[in-house]
Each structure stands twice: as C-alpha cells, then as structure tokens.
C-alpha cells in the first residue's frame, strides 16, 4: 500500500462564532489533505460539548467568541480531553496567540487582514495535518459526554460596586491570575447600553474572560460575568443541576430593589446556591445596596469582604455593610483582592 493510502483521515471540529467563517472553513478544509470536517460549533460552550461527543483529531478555533471564548474553551478542553488545537487569530491580536499557546494550543494561523480565508488554506491544511506526526496517546480514554456540573468552579466571587466602581473593578480583575479556580459575577450600577462596552474594557486588562452576562451562561473558572445594565443578575440552577447565570428584567419576582442591577439580589442568590463556597466583595459606592445581601452570604457560611475607607472613592456601601457586623474583613482594594485570591486557592476557606 502506498504512503498516501496508509495516511489516516483526520476529523476536524470547527469552532467559530461567525456562520460565514464556519461555512468557509468547512469548504476549505473538508476533503483537503485527508481531512474531513466532523462538526462545527458557534461558541466555546457548544464547542466543548461537541469536542467531547465527537472526539475530533484536531480543532480549528476562533478565540474571540461570545458566551464562552476561546481561552476558556482551551482551559476546559485540555483538562477534560487534551486535543490538538489550531488557532485562527487576527494579526492585530498577537498577545492572544501567545496566551492560547500557553494554554495548550498546538499552532496558529493569522487571518488575512481583508477578504476570506482562501489565501491561508494551504497553511491551515498543513498545520492540521501535522497532527499525524504527534505522539499523543489515549486521547479518547475516559472521554465522555459533557456533564456541565463537572465544570462548576470550586469558588465563586460575587462583586458589587457603584460610584467609583469601574476603576476599582478594572484593578481587581487585572490582578486575578488566569488559572485561579474561581468564577466572578459582577453587579455594577450602570445604565443599559453601557455594560457591554464596560465588559470589553475589563477584558482587555484581565487574564479572565470578561463578558456581559447572557441568561443561561455557564458559571466556570476563569470567567467573569457582568450584569447587563437595567437587568438583575443572579445565580441559579436548572432542572439539570447546572450552575448558570440568570439575567432577569427589572420587575422580576423577588425582594424589592432600588437599583437594577441589584447587588443585594446577586449576593442573596450566591448565599442560596453556594453557601460557604461563595465570597461576597462589596466595593466603593453610595447608599446601602449590598448590605443585606452580604449579611445573607455571611449567614450561609461564605466569606464577606468590603473595601475600606482607605481606597474607596465613596465609602457609603462598604460602611453600611460593615456596620451590620457581617463583614469578615474591611480591606484596601489590593489587600481585598489578595484575600480573594487566597480564598479561591484554599479549598478549606470558609
């Protein structure tokens, strides 16, 4: 038999949020150099489920996607079923490429600055085909259908802020290590139509994947979900028992709240869903939002932190919470962040 005849077919999974890009990749890859496209996915969450179901030989991955981005996908895939991944990346986002390689990607292909992907077809085929030369054993051993409950992080931080919050949150999220076994949910008092851009700004300076929350988003380590302006954000479990974000309209049933998003509602939901696995952190802001919610987290056995007058732009909310006696530690912003990291890393933390 010829060498060509002995060459095994490689099954490819394409993960890209653009339908046009997915279609083009299928056309370019399918049948080329012994490759067949076994499936496609529109975001990281769907891609992870398909990778575990289809057990492809190689994944072609876009990094910038909604819901679950490529970085979170890589972390979870390499933990569950290590698979060769070829990243498609914009030339203007070189740092993203190196981050992806650090997370386990095999190689990358730079997208053409204009036009379609045809100019890089041969490069894509070649880099996917290099999988044949890799010494990767037992990739499918133990692989099984995705149970999203297995992705639930060991610790979850719920963070509330108002006046002065954008800068404080940017500083806090920038200091969190990317491999921390922690998910973060944020309620920042901010009008509608601003929180999407705010999440993008936070993401640019953070090792975490930071996105505006969408109802039903998985809560996973290395990811921060920002409450959409004009909506409440809570933690909830469906009938399947999976921990997800619930995005609720202003009039949704529940304790009355002056602000939307409500810090109290987010904190109370963390107390109900997580108990001692939750940390509530109340940052700078005016008023009393978060005061009752932080007391609920304390009563459920979670860790409660508030920003001290030393660094808070407005000390109103942290002070109101501290006066209830429900705050475990009143700390400057950097010390508060360090305590949060310690909490995430210590499985025995309260």
Curated annotation (Swiss-Prot):
The primary site where this protein sits is cytoplasm
SMART domains in UniProt:
REC
Cellular component annotations (GO), alphabetically ordered: cytoplasm
Q: Give the matching NCBIfam families.
A: PRK00742.1
Name the gene behind this protein: cheB6
- Catalyses which reaction(s): [protein]-L-glutamate 5-O-methyl ester + H2O = L-glutamyl-[protein] + methanol + H(+); L-glutaminyl-[protein] + H2O = L-glutamyl-[protein] + NH4(+)
GO biological process terms, alphabetically, are: chemotaxis
Q: Which InterPro entries match?
A: CheB-like, CheB_C, CheY-like_superfamily, Sig_transdc_resp-reg_Me-estase, Sig_transdc_resp-reg_receiver
Q: Name one GO molecular function term.
A: protein-glutamine glutaminase activity
* Protein name, entry field: Protein-glutamate methylesterase/protein-glutamine glutaminase 6
Record PROSITE patterns = CHEB, RESPONSE_REGULATORY
- Domain Response regulatory, first and last residues per copy: 11-126
Q: Tell me the residues on which 4-aspartylphosphate occurs.
A: 62
- Residue stretches spanning the membrane: none
Q: Name one Pfam family in it.
A: CheB_methylest
